[in-house]
UniProtKB/Swiss-Prot annotation:
It holds the Pfam family UPRTase. It comes from Shouchella clausii (strain KSM-K16) (Alkalihalobacillus clausii). This is Uracil phosphoribosyltransferase. Its EC number is 2.4.2.9. Uracil binds at I194, G199, D200, A201. NCBIfam families: PRK00129.1, upp.
Length: 209
């Protein structure tokens, strides 16, 4: 069973409080999501392997540690996942970026795929799947299904907030995927929104309704 990591770092929790606040405007919301994503990247990549190397500093040789050739990939789920991708890319700029486009039917709440573009060597990469909200889990499960069909073998899921129902569904369908959250919230309401949540992440990121 994949592990669930709730990242309780004070800076993450402080910034998340403003992300949740309904009075936070689009510009500040976008900046805060970017900042929290960057902070989360530190924890998500904590166990990446290192290898010894030698370099020359301005005053002489030094033994250092570098990432051990691990290939990484980011896969934001469109559209809201885009809001987190730049923050993570600043931490791991060599990562390749793919995209999965899904929309959720407002009546059935079921996800529908409309776009997939991935690195050619997706099967060789550790993929960081990004979506700010893990509500029912339907969209994330569909995205991971799509990635696995195209050869992906190793994935981690990164979300700002999640409902227990969504976490349980992802764990049931994809027990090999670890989940990283800034917060695990109380529940879903009757409309499928996370409570207390932060509203519609896509609308708040892009100033739409």
């Amino acid at each position: 069973m994949g592990k669930v990591h709730v990242l309780d770092h004070p800076l993450i929790q402080h910034k998340l409080s403003y992300i949740r606040d309904k009075h936070t405007g689009t510009k500040e919301f976008r900046e805060l999501v970017d900042e929290v994503a960057a902070l989360m990247a530190f924890e998500v990549t904590r166990d990446l392997p290192l290898e010894a190397a030698e370099i020359e500093t301005p005053v002489g040789p030094a033994k250092v540690k570098k990432l051990a050739g691990k290939k990484l990939g980011l896969v934001p789920i469109l559209r809201a996942g885009i809001g987190m991708s730049e923050g993570i890319l600043r931490m791991i700029p060599a990562a390749r970026v793919g995209h999965v486009g899904l929309y959720r039917d407002p009546e059935t709440l079921k996800p529908h795929e409309y776009y997939v573009k991935l690195p050619n060597d997706v099967e060789e990469r550790e993929l960081l799947v990004i979506d700010p909200m893990l509500a029912t889990g339907g969209s994330v499960v569909e995205a991971i299904n799509s990635l696995k069909k195209r050869g992906a073998k190793s994935m981690r899921l990164i979300c700002l907030v999640a409902a227990p129902e969504g976490v349980a569904y992802v764990q049931k369908e994809h027990p090999d995927v670890d989940i990283y959250l800034a917060a695990l919230d109380e529940k879903l309401n009757e409309k499928g929104y996370i409570v207390p949540g932060l509203g519609d992440a896509g609308d708040r990121l892009f100033g739409t309704k």
